[in-house]
């Protein structure tokens, strides 16, 4: 098992390129299942544990996969299975994305109940409701979701989500693209990753209106054709790197980004006293000598993202005052706080609100990751802590950050990956 060893106190400077979005790559890869001929070529697919697991899953289903550099080529014309097994699905919740495409293309799908990050309840009921609205019969047997159509194709219907859901919106879009008739989706997610999925599906021949809005209309088509498509940048990775610069009082530039996807995050960095300079497809953050305490409420896009909440808490440990952090997406997403407090942070949890008292002198110790973004939060804390911090179980980090220690080291961090033996008690 791997850990990251960080000697804190180094100011980050320099320039780094943003990776492709993990949260966009996974539904894009799933959408290739909708093509019954030819090869889809996806550019800017990050090399991550989750993207590799998704490639394994498609290969298990019978797809031909080729990955080189950041280009992924997928041919799904010879699929031989409609079951996504527990052995693969347990590794990440996003495996549920294959449900809609398999059901739309073959009329049947069996998907193991998902795994992934362990924080709070994240039900899949909205995915199942969407499939039922398109005419599927759903049952759960022996730990598997079993979905089927009595005959023919899925049929268009009206899907109204009671709450915004990125995953359920993506699954509904993919299934509806091959459904017979018209599907309308209200309260659809407007995250950039969903807009990218719409763009990919439309490039393949899907008829989708309203991309980027909460109201989508999909006219089903008989088939989709393979295309080449470039993934969007990872706004969460970019935000994490900006936080790394801010917490170390550094100055960094990130290239290959679209700043319009980061409006809420950049606004908060500015409120905290950081200077942001935008230039075409890059931006530069210059940290102030004194960070100002800045409250956040994590909510669906276009508001501050829940996937940046943990990193913001780490940053606010160095702010000159107290900050309030509320997560309206995942109310219980505070597993990182006890570990931050072990480093010397002073953070209270009051119901669904975290109160961060800063500035606090953090000192290095051994901490343990509990999920993907908690891992990033602990790395940020390690960058500013005095002495040596060891972050264990960084396999969580590898699910969503491409070569993160290499990027941080390039910017001046003293960070190394080492292997260690974890003993059970």
Curated annotation (Swiss-Prot):
Cited InterPro entries: Enolpyruvate_Tfrase_dom (IPR001986), Enolpyruvate_Tfrase_sf (IPR036968), MurA_subfamily (IPR050068), RNA3'P_cycl/enolpyr_Trfase_a/b (IPR013792), UDP_GlcNAc_COvinyl_MurA (IPR005750)
GO cellular component, one term: cytoplasm
Alphabetical GO biological process terms: cell division; cell wall organization; peptidoglycan biosynthetic process; regulation of cell shape; UDP-N-acetylgalactosamine biosynthetic process
Modified residues (2-(S-cysteinyl)pyruvic acid O-phosphothioketal): 117
Binding residues for UDP-N-acetyl-alpha-D-glucosamine: 93, 122-126, 307, 329
Active site: residue positions: 117
Cellular compartment(s): Cytoplasm
EC number(s) per entry: 2.5.1.7
Keyword Cytoplasm included in the entry's annotation: yes
Primary subcellular site in the record, as a coarse category: cytoplasm
Pathway: Cell wall biogenesis; peptidoglycan biosynthesis
Molecular function (Gene Ontology), one example: UDP-N-acetylglucosamine 1-carboxyvinyltransferase activity
Keywords from the UniProt entry: Cell cycle, Cell division, Cell shape, Cell wall biogenesis/degradation, Cytoplasm, Peptidoglycan synthesis, Pyruvate, Transferase
Pfam families per UniProt: EPSP_synthase
Residue positions binding phosphoenolpyruvate: 22-23
SUPFAM superfamilies: EPT/RTPC-like (SSF55205)
Catalytic activity: phosphoenolpyruvate + UDP-N-acetyl-alpha-D-glucosamine = UDP-N-acetyl-3-O-(1-carboxyvinyl)-alpha-D-glucosamine + phosphate
Homology family: Belongs to the EPSP synthase family. MurA subfamily.
Known function: Cell wall formation. Adds enolpyruvyl to UDP-N-acetylglucosamine.
Protein name: UDP-N-acetylglucosamine 1-carboxyvinyltransferase
Organism: Prosthecochloris aestuarii (strain DSM 271 / SK 413)
Encoding gene, per UniProt annotation: murA
